[in-house]
Amino acid sequence: LYTGTGTIANFVSKQARQVIGIEYVPEAIEDAKVNAEINGIKNTLFFAGDMKDMLTQDFINQYGRPDVIITDPPRAGMHQDVVDVILFAEPKRIVYVSCNPATQARDLQLLDVKYKVKAIQPVDMFPHTHHVENVVLLELRNED
């Protein structure tokens, strides 16, 4: 989710039967498709549109429930509708990459109803600034 030019989607494509990327910026999606073609990747699908409008229960029903969701939202974090569809889809794992720890914490709290945090890794991609990328691995809670 929030795939940009498809860097992560194309990178993980060798480990998946199919990878779907959604991004708001149509030009970025065109670049994602070109990047897949240049690299001979044939198991990716990319869609342009507002995440809250694109990622719906109907979308999940049409393309299948994902085993893993990798999300890298903008600073504002994920829209509540996106969180709701993720909770509906129930992937086994979520990898949440964020440049805003505050909105990431808010979204993690929303996902906490079904997911537990397994690992957290901050990455100092912008040395000598207060900015940090944070990567969180979430796993679906067992229904015991």
Residue spans of the language-model regions?
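Rossmann-like S-adenosyl-L-methionine
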Residues: 1-144
